[in-house]
Amino acid sequence: MATYLEFIQQNEERDGVRFSWNVWPSSRLEATRMVVPLACLLTPLRERPDLPPVQYEPVLCSRPTCKAVLNPLCQVDYRAKLWACNFCFQRNQFPPAYAGISEVNQPAELMPQFSTIEYIVQRGPQTPLIFLYVVDTCLEEEDLQALKESLQMSLSLLPADALVGLITFGRMIQVHELSCEGISKSYVFRGTKDLTAKQIQDMLGLSRPAVPIQQGRPLQAPEQPVISSRFLQPVHKIDMNLTDLLGELQRDPWPVTQGKRPLRSTGVALSIAVGLLEGTFPNTGARIMLFTGGPPTQGPGMVVGDELKTPIRSWHDIEKDNARFMKKATKHYETLANRTATNGHCIDIYACALDQTGLLEMKCCANLTGGHMVMGDSFNTSLFKQTFQRVFNKGLNGEFRMAFGANLEVKTSRELKIAGAIGPCVSLNVKGPCVSENELGIGGTSQWKICGLDPCTTLAIYFEVVNQHNAPIPQGGRGAVQFVTQYQHSSTQKRIRVTTIARNWADAQSQLQHIEAAFDQEAAAVLMARLGVYRAESEEGPDVLRWLDRQLIRLCQKFGQYNKDDPNSFRLSESFSLYPQFMFHLRRSPFLQVFNNSPDESSYYRHHFARQDLTQSLIMIQPILYAYSFHGPPEPVLLDSSSILPDRILLMDTFFQIVIYLGETIAQWQKAGYQDMPEYENFKHLLQAPLDDAQEILQTRFPMPRYVHTEHGGSQARFLLSKVNPSQTHNNLYAWGQESGAPILTDDVSLQVFMDHLKKLAVSSAA
């Protein structure tokens, strides 16, 4: 019998699913007493090189309110060619193509190893992928030049038949016609006035052909090219012309006087991009890629005025309700994001500037559409250049790692209902019998739209057990969930990926130890963290921390072993033991602590946390620390100030930064140049080892992390010191005659103090 850890691992590898509980409490009452909700992390397009897609349509349950897909959990009568749906128990005929099936000749979707299966379905004409570049020209010369080179480079990475378009903006917005005649023409719009989709389409001459397409199918083929030909062209036709056009782009010509910001019409430029795609290619895979080097300063969506003496809003301003443009700008971008999501398009934001660029207001454009958000200091850095290049990376099978216009539907057996989802998605408002009235995250629906996704995109999906306490589930009963993801593959094929999973029910009163042993503390920590970060968007920070603390105390009261009022007797079993420290680091993380971060930085961190898979999310919550020394091979060490020793090099991975920190002695040796002397070859290798390991992480991570190389006493050592558990501070340094580790100058509580308080509260009879 495999251990639960192995079971969890195998399921994640096969199905891309991690549940908080892997044996489910069998009644609503017992489930609420578990504190951590029944929920899962789902990576719909997890890479499975061993899973070739099948070239036929899935077989669906015939009950109109169910339509679940045939799967290995269904009961099959091979003689009568019937199958019973495991969700609604409807008996269904197999289609004629399945006439030859038998116990020894099963179709793939009935085999247990195909609990996840992918179908290629041909529905409607194939349309090429679309990339629309929206480029800010109010940049410094050096930055603009670097951005132009990156954009020119990207043309060679696009699929040859992809359509590409270009909009540039500064004080005015220019929509460029991309013809092959070599004459550059563009339509110019004022940046101060918002336009409706209809106005944009009329001005660009897009409305005429749109009517026949709606009514008569035969006209579609000849009319479609007319629409796109002027603004969106196949890259293989116009790559030379577009390369020249990008090369000739100039800085915004409007003079910027001393003490002023350039007038930047980002809000209207995005609005025109959304309107252009809405009128030409609704419900087709398309990316709007916004490159901006500063905040929007005029027109709808502006986040700050053009006077440099008035700084852009800070958290302090927002708390004091002193951010005068914020609400209006956020509303403008939310409207655009919802329109974009309705059309199945996604918006990427690449913001590179030393000051804030308005990501707080614009975040919904990427968050609701599944677009990327990249934040850097300048377009002329390897951080931006390599991250942008990775957008076009190819997977193990030589295909782009991007998919478009996905529709995720969740089906459950009758004892469960769906409470909601958290991730880069929007609700499709599909009500049904399996939708709960209690919402967690984006609820009230059993279907969500994810306009842009890749093999790492991960959603958190929350469930509610609705089975009544007095209606027991028969012994050995299993609950089931099916995830059906329909999407446009980067090869423009329509595909459907179906994952069907089942877990055992258990009576929490007589079989609590089974439920407890099957707790996945890593998944639970990430699922609770997502709920906390989701709440932090609309609630006060201290309230969210209090809520997380309360949940942690309740969990410890429920599953800890202790004598009343005796904190020293408190123990947590192995399947819960790491959970409190995840919560400790989450409380200190930039997702919940806005101190020392700008609103843009907080939005950026939260954006990535809401879409990464379990492994990356855990690194964000509790960074990984490796130590390199002469005492042995590199080893993971505690994220604690006691790990900072003079004769060690530390490598810390926080997901957003890779920090290499040289201990005091190592730094002195390096300054003395020992690594250059032949007799200290081993010291040279020691210095090189963390650099090689860091390089490996830098090669694969998206977005590329910031790389920090520092030493004891260096100004950038703060990146490490702010993350480690401050077990030794300036207050307790001399207690117990401690010698090891570095004291941290902080008033933050340490993990030890946190755990002591937690134990005290958990065992208290007053609680």
Curated annotation (Swiss-Prot):
A Pfam family cross-referenced in the UniProt record is Sec23_trunk
Is the keyword Cell division in the record?
A: no
- SUPFAM superfamilies associated with the record: beta-sandwich domain of Sec23/24 (SSF81995), C-terminal, gelsolin-like domain of Sec23/24 (SSF82754), Helical domain of Sec23/24 (SSF81811), vWA-like (SSF53300), Zn-finger domain of Sec23/24 (SSF82919)
Domain of life of the organism encoding this protein: Eukaryota
Q: Which UniProt keywords apply?
A: Cytoplasm, Cytoplasmic vesicle, Endoplasmic reticulum, ER-Golgi transport, Membrane, Metal-binding, Protein transport, Transport, Zinc
**What are the GO MF terms of this UniProt record?**
GTPase activator activity; zinc ion binding
Per the record, the GO terms for biological process are: COPII-coated vesicle cargo loading; intracellular protein transport
- Topology versus the membrane: Peripheral membrane protein
| Cleaved signal peptide residues | none
Q: Is the keyword Protein transport assigned to this protein?
A: yes
Gelsolin-like repeats located where?
Answer: 634-720
Q: Where does Zn(2+) bind?
A: C61, C66, C85, C88
Q: What is its main location?
A: membrane
Subcellular compartments: Cytoplasmic vesicle, COPII-coated vesicle membrane; Endoplasmic reticulum membrane; Cytoplasm, Cytosol
In UniProt terms, what function does this protein have? Component of the coat protein complex II (COPII) which promotes the formation of transport vesicles from the endoplasmic reticulum (ER). The coat has two main functions, the physical deformation of the endoplasmic reticulum membrane into vesicles and the selection of cargo molecules for their transport to the Golgi complex.
| Free-text comment on this protein's domains from its UniProt entry | The Gelsolin-like repeat mediates interaction with proteins containing PPP motifs.
Q: What is this protein called?
A: Protein transport protein Sec23A
Q: Name the species this protein comes from.
A: Gallus gallus (Chicken)
